[in-house]
Amino acid sequence: MTDLFAVLDLPRRPWLDAEEIKQRHHSLMASGSFSSPTLLNEARRTLQNPALRIRHFLALEFPEYQPANRPQQDWDFFLKVGEATRQATELAARKSSLTHPLARAALQKEILSGREALSLLKEEIGKRLAAADERLQAFEKNPEALASLAEEFAFLQKNETSVREALLALDQGLA
């Protein structure tokens, strides 16, 4: 397995500054001295994403580690995000299928309400990601805790993407 931390000449640790990763990648690409731009890009993609970075760190530092059990996520929150994004997608589809301006205007209140709910969820996800990032910065060399944190990041990033896409669909519905 290629050590992607070494590819970008970064310290091997679960938390890295995103700006430092970007700057290192850009300087190595600009120097032209690196033989494989694909490997540089893979290193940046992996190390830029906290969940992927933690998993890569675990694979390098604890190659024999197998998680004892899958960490529990906040499934109530997941269901809340799922319901809000489903409603937003349905609203956007309903609005795009309407041709009469008055019928479209009648949905505006629902669309604005859905957008507000999604914005609150996006804010909550941002807070949870920031809290997870703080815990990652103060990491212990505990593979179980790191694996749990990687799952949490992946869970939150997936929800963040869903909310962002639903907001985009609603924003297009506002036009």
For the regions a language model picked out, list residue spans one by one.
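C-terminal accessory/regulatory regions appended to core domains
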Residues: 1-175
